[in-house]
Amino acid sequence: MPNLLREVNDGIAVLTLHRPGKLNALDYALVDALAASLDELEADPGVRAVILTGSGERAFSAGADIPEFAGSVEGGAERALREFVRRGQGLTRRIEAYSKPLIAAVNGIAFGAGCEITEAAPLALASDRARFAKPEIRLGFPPPFGGTQRLPRLVGRKRALQMILTAEPIDAHQAASIGLVNRVVEHTALLSEARLLAGQIARHSPAAVAACLRAVTRGLNVSIDEGLAVEAAQFASMVPTPDIRQGIHAFLSRRKE
């Protein structure tokens, strides 16, 4: 049985984490499959946006597969870093820097690595049944897939530390109020709302969308002056393209009507 489901309709891909018996916990095979699928979809010009969700009614992802991770820890620090941390950080970096709009459609619990994927995703919608938590401290280690870095940038240092140090979950509405997700939707409407959002973005120039994603993501981790240089470079990259000319021409034509 595949651990990752994929479907593409009308230029929108839906990837579904599919380990329902394990609450879609991320074992190494699933992390690798997700990374490979993201690469394939990014290279496909027919795909304009990607939605990532979880299988079943209970979970987006309960986090890392702890029994598998435990074996890596038993092998020592270097093995744990190689097999677990670097693999997971590589995935969340890939998601954060994705050149197409990637929407996390969080359909249930998003604990540990599931929360870290949500943090990395450029956009996120949450079912009203979703819950988010950083339970790693209960297992004796800090969040290892980027959670100590991205969460404070998203929600602020104090809110992030409260989640990280207490391991207490928050509900979907709390997640939206602090900026972890864009908004909350009814559980049964989650995928349709995610597709609607993807479609709203996909109608724009793919090159312009990619430039916006790069400008915002790269600018987050540099000074404002460096960020402005990134923004200018992304604008300049669009000037030679037909996209900008078509967009300006369409705007001017409407004004003349």
Where is each model-derived feature located?
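Terminal peptide-recognition signature
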Residues: 15, 19, 34, 52, ...
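Glycine- (often His-adjacent) and acidic-residue-rich active-site loop
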Residues: 54-91, 110, 140, 223
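C-terminal alpha-helix plus adjacent terminal tail
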Residues: 1-10, 57, 167-173, 192-257
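Conserved CoA-thioester-binding segment of acyl-CoA-metabolizing enzymes
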Residues: 1-53, 79, 86, 90-93
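Crotonase-fold acyl-CoA enzyme core
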Residues: 93-207, 236-237, 241, 246
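Glycine-centered loop/turn positions within well-structured domains
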Residues: 21, 58, 67, 149, ...
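Activation segment of ePK-like protein kinases, specifically the conserved APE
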Residues: 22, 180, 256-257
